[in-house]
């Protein structure tokens, strides 16, 4: 007979009796699992902060949320960004920018660059699949974007990998269920 909580054993639970499994753990196992979970979360945060420093972008990875950039990028594509201040913005580049008053960044192509004599650079964007430029998306009275509006420039992508994020935002119950299952797995997984 196998005793619950014995090292290297795991008794299958009938259904998902998460709290029953937690009660069966001794305090040391529970502390270990909580610490393990905290290490996973803090490691993910450190990797994210490291990417921010390496890429110069406040958001080094973004998901394309609409079809406005088709055929170049589709809804759900994952973009990798850089935003080095010394690199000039050129027509034809795909940029991710934020508009004052909007929470979600926009992924569009630079179609015109306007450089003043004093060195100030302004530019105009448009989605590849859109009929008109983005002036209607900019804040009222703004006709051009400036470098400060740019979150990053697309340097690479993974097709459709970001659909998981879109599904989790479109169906919040799915997101919470997935997070609960992952959290329960980390807490209840026992080392052999």
Curated annotation (Swiss-Prot):
Protein name: Signal peptidase complex catalytic subunit SEC11C
PTM comment, free text: May undergo processing at the N-terminus.
Entry domain remark: The C-terminal short (CTS) helix is essential for catalytic activity. It may be accommodated as a transmembrane helix in the thinned membrane environment of the complex, similarly to the signal peptide in the complex substrates.
Key words of the record: Endoplasmic reticulum, Hydrolase, Membrane, Protease, Signal-anchor, Transmembrane, Transmembrane helix
GO molecular function: peptidase activity; serine-type endopeptidase activity
Segments traversing the membrane: 29-48
Gene designation: SEC11C
Similarity-based family: Belongs to the peptidase S26B family.
Keyword Repressor recorded: no
Subcellular location, record wording: Endoplasmic reticulum membrane
Parts of the chain on the Lumenal side: 49-192
Reactions the enzyme catalyzes: Cleavage of hydrophobic, N-terminal signal or leader sequences from secreted and periplasmic proteins
Species classification: Eukaryota, Metazoa, Chordata, Craniata, Vertebrata
Organism: Canis lupus familiaris
Major localisation: endoplasmic reticulum
Its job: Catalytic component of the signal peptidase complex (SPC) which catalyzes the cleavage of N-terminal signal sequences from nascent proteins as they are translocated into the lumen of the endoplasmic reticulum. Specifically cleaves N-terminal signal peptides that contain a hydrophobic alpha-helix (h-region) shorter than 18-20 amino acids.
UniProt xrefs under Gene3D superfamilies: Umud Fragment, subunit A
Region (C-terminal short (CTS) helix): 177-188
Transport recorded as keyword: no
InterPro entries recorded: LexA/Signal_pep-like_sf (IPR036286), Pept_S26A_signal_pept_1_CS (IPR019758), Pept_S26A_signal_pept_1_Ser-AS (IPR019756), Peptidase_S24_S26A/B/C (IPR015927), Peptidase_S26 (IPR019533), Peptidase_S26B (IPR001733)
EC number in record: 3.4.21.89
Complex formation: Component of the signal peptidase complex paralog C (SPC-C) composed of a catalytic subunit SEC11C and three accessory subunits SPCS1, SPCS2 and SPCS3. Within the complex, interacts with SPCS2 and SPCS3. The complex induces a local thinning of the ER membrane which is used to measure the length of the signal peptide (SP) h-region of protein substrates. This ensures the selectivity of the complex towards h-regions shorter than 18-20 amino acids.
Annotated PROSITE patterns: SPASE_I_1, SPASE_I_3
Cytoplasmic side: 2-28
One GO BP annotation of this record: signal peptide processing
Active-site residues annotated for this sequence: 68, 108, 134
């Amino acid at each position: 007979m196998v005793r619950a909580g014995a090292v290297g054993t795991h008794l299958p639970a009938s259904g998902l009796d998460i709290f029953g499994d937690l009660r069966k753990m001794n305090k040391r196992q529970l502390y270990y699992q909580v610490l393990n979970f905290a290490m996973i979360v803090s490691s993910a945060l450190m990797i994210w902060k490291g990417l921010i420093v390496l890429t110069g972008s406040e958001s080094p990875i973004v998901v394309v949320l609409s079809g406005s950039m088709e055929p170049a990028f589709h809804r759900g594509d994952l973009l990798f960004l850089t935003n080095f201040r010394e690199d000039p913005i050129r027509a034809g580049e795909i940029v991710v920018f934020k508009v004052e008053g909007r929470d979600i960044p926009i992924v569009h192509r630079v179609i015109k660059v306007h450089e003043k004599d004093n060195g100030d650079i302004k530019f105009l964007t448009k989605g590849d699949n859109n009929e008109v430029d983005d002036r209607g998306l900019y804040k009222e009275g703004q006709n051009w974007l400036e470098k400060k509006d740019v979150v990053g420039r697309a340097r690479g992508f993974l097709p459709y990998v970001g659909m998981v994020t879109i599904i989790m935002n479109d169906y919040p119950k799915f997101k919470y269920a997935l997070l609960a299952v992952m959290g329960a797995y980390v807490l209840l997984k026992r080392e052999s």
